């Protein structure tokens, strides 16, 4: 063979489809390409004999560099490619048990041979090694979570064993992991911390707040359709407090379902948001300052009272024809207003204070009240009539509180007839 006339050609090997082996080969090659660039085309023939009848001897003299691999010639037609190991980065993704993703604020430490470092919080929910720290083959490392993101708890598992073997393969706690672009991926989930909240129920009495028991509140959460669904209901205790726990982020609302006996019911509908870190966002001002837990406050008012006077004769039968006058705070009313005779008199919407009930007209044949009747309604809802406490005056629901009074008139005793001897 005339070596002066030798030419160099190129042949491309591609991984066959559905081939899982690590060996690629081509047989019966008859043509080569003159170039190895984008104009690659197998048009260069391979004659078996030269012009002197001598057989050509073909061999591969070199392999064009494959990025990321080193080359080794085994024989005239066989080359071995070995993937070059590059030190590895670590990327931890932090998620929440609530379904929220990419939590910031966690702290991870990595230790190993000649390595003791803290991962960098990238502020996008991922954590990676400092730029000057990479994981080497043939080494073992321990990853430790030392601090959970805000609003979350450290799990029972806080350490992970990372091994990079001599071949550069990676395993975490014994399970093989696939790297991408020299990065080891690892997702870690933290449990969302249960968030305690409260609402305190009170009323004003003599210029001071007085806590109220037996009010019922509902904690509601907005669903995907935009409507609120009740999560829990609780009654206030003797300190006026209802206690709730929030187990996931979302949009919430606190609603009063029923007030204490004798008091109005005001829904409130206090809307607030809990973000993925367990922080509450609320635009209202009714927040208890310096409370150990986030606490809403909710004021209720004593409902007005209705006084119903039943006029009766001394035999307890209804007696019509009387008139009554009630005077007190913002009140000076005489009934009946229309002049029609009645045995029932209703004075409505009375607020706490002292009242005087006077019988201004007595039916003929009966004795009127000797003294006016004193009625006292206190700010705590208790009622006395002439110093005697009246029971069962507080009413639930929307109806006013009710005071009932029976006023009995005695019939006049007729004077004896007198006369002389005729």
Feature map (PLM): residue ranges:
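Solvent-exposed loop/turn and edge beta-strand elements of beta-rich ligand-binding domains
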Residues: 1-422
């Amino acid at each position: 063979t005339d070596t002066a006339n030798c030419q160099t050609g190129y042949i491309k090997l591609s991984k066959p489809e559905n081939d899982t082996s690590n060996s690629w080969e081509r047989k019966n090659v008859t043509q080569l390409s003159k170039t190895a660039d984008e104009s690659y085309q197998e048009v260069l023939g391979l004659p078996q004999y030269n012009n002197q009848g001598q057989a050509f001897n073909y061999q591969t003299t070199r392999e064009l560099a494959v990025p990321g691999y080193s080359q080794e010639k085994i024989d005239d037609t066989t080359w071995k490619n070995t993937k070059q190991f590059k030190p590895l980065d670590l990327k931890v993704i932090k998620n929440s048990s609530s379904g929220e993703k990419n939590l910031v604020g966690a702290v991870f430490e990595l230790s190993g041979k000649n390595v003791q470092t803290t991962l960098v919080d990238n502020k996008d929910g991922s954590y990676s090694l400092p730029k000057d720290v990479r994981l080497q083959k043939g080494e073992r490392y321990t990853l430790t979570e030392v601090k959970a993101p805000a609003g979350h708890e450290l799990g029972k598992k806080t350490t992970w064993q990372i091994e990079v073997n001599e071949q550069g393969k990676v395993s975490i706690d014994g399970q093989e992991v696939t790297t991408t672009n020299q990065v080891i991926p690892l997702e870690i989930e933290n449990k969302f911390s249960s968030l305690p909240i409260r609402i305190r129920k009170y009323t004003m009495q003599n210029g001071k707040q007085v806590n109220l028991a037996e009010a019922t509140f509902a904690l509601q959460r907005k669903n995907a359709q935009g409507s609120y669904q009740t999560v829990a209901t609780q009654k206030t205790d003797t300190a006026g407090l209802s206690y709730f726990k929030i187990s996931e982020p979302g949009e919430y609302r606190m609603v009063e379902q029923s007030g204490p006996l004798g008091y109005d019911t005001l829904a409130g509908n206090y809307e607030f948001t809990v973000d993925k870190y367990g922080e509450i966002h609320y635009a209202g001002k009714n927040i208890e300052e310096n409370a150990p837990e986030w606490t809403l406050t909710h004021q209720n008012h004593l409902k007005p009272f209705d006084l119903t006077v039943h006029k009766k004769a001394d035999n307890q039968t209804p007696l019509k024809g009387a008139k009554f006058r009630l005077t007190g705070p913002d009140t000076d009313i005489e009934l009946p207003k229309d002049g029609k005779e009645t045995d029932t008199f209703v004075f409505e919407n009375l607020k706490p204070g002292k009242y005087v009930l006077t019988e201004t007209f007595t039916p003929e044949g009966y004795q009127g009240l000797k003294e006016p009747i004193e009625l006292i309604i206190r700010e705590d809802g208790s009622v006395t009539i002439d110093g005697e406490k009246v029971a069962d005056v507080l009413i639930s629901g929307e109806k006013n509180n009710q005071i009932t009074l029976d006023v009995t008139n005695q019939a006049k005793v007729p004077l004896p007839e007198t006369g002389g001897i005729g």
